[in-house]
Design a protein with these regions (language model features):
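Macromolecular interaction modules
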Residues: 1-68
């Protein structure tokens, strides 16, 4: 059964366009690789400054290992 790690970022104090570019073009791939995640998705919470990244793992053990 898959397990998920959800990361919420408050971008209200930074340039959200720069953050968006960095996350999409650099960080998401690197984080997925570092976490050894099966899949990774990202997006924005509508009408807010919050960004979400969702990392999918094969099981809860692998998700917990990503946080160590």
């Amino acid at each position: 059964m898959s397990a998920y790690l959800i990361v919420r970022s408050d971008t209200s104090q930074i340039d959200s366009k720069d953050f968006d570019y960095w996350y999409e073009n650099e960080h998401l791939y690197e984080a997925k690789k570092q976490f050894m995640a099966k899949n990774a998705k990202r997006g924005w919470v509508q009408n807010s400054n919050f960004h979400l990244a969702i990392y999918e793992f094969e099981n809860i053990k692998k998700a917990k290992n990503a946080m160590d």
